[in-house]
């Protein structure tokens, strides 16, 4: 059992027959009332992100998640295929379980497969990833009022805002948490 006051990003727990990972947790106390813990959590079975509020001191069951290092091989349209780096065993995961992660998967990338009681839940990406810009337009001179950006398409098809100095064919570092530009690659 784990006390909800100990919630930090990355902690996994069971609640109402579902498995969640904490994305963020905010502790608040109002006057003489009991403290509350407002958490943003991701359901590891469905991929849905929700906000749950717990009473301070409430206890939930800790979920012991097994993480296996895998390499992404390919996407066949309905599922992705990963290969275990040590046993060379291949595993398929439905695309519906990993819709967000699909935006950042390139051939050969190392990911962590999350399993709970031999049930495949989802994959965990590195915090930042390097991707190539496949298309963007040239900067327009004079368009530099406040923090100017332009749209760019990555090699995976995902679109992000990048600074004006980034050109087509360059690599950029992207955060997999929020899908935003971090720096040049």
Swiss-Prot record:
| Superkingdom | Bacteria
Q: Give the pathway.
A: Protein biosynthesis; polypeptide chain elongation
Extract the PROSITE patterns matched here: EFP
User: Which UniProt key words apply to this protein?
Assistant: Cytoplasm, Elongation factor, Protein biosynthesis
Q: Does the keyword Nucleotide-binding apply?
A: no
Which Pfam families does the record associate with it?
EFP (PF01132), EFP_N (PF08207), Elong-fact-P_C (PF09285)
Gene3D superfamilies from the entry?
A: 2.30.30.30, Nucleic acid-binding proteins
Indicate whether Cytoplasm appears among the record's keywords.
yes
List the SUPFAM superfamilies hit by this protein, alphabetically.
Answer: Nucleic acid-binding proteins, Translation proteins SH3-like domain
Q: Please give the SMART domains that the UniProt record associates with this protein.
A: EFP (SM01185), Elong-fact-P_C (SM00841)
What family classification does the UniProt entry report for this protein? Belongs to the elongation factor P family.
Q: What does this protein do?
A: Involved in peptide bond synthesis. Stimulates efficient translation and peptide-bond synthesis on native or reconstituted 70S ribosomes in vitro. Probably functions indirectly by altering the affinity of the ribosome for aminoacyl-tRNA, thus increasing their reactivity as acceptors for peptidyl transferase.
What protein is this chain from?
Answer: Elongation factor P
Organism, by scientific name, is Mesomycoplasma hyopneumoniae (strain 7448)
The opening ranks of the lineage are: Bacteria, Bacillati, Mycoplasmatota, Mycoplasmoidales, Metamycoplasmataceae
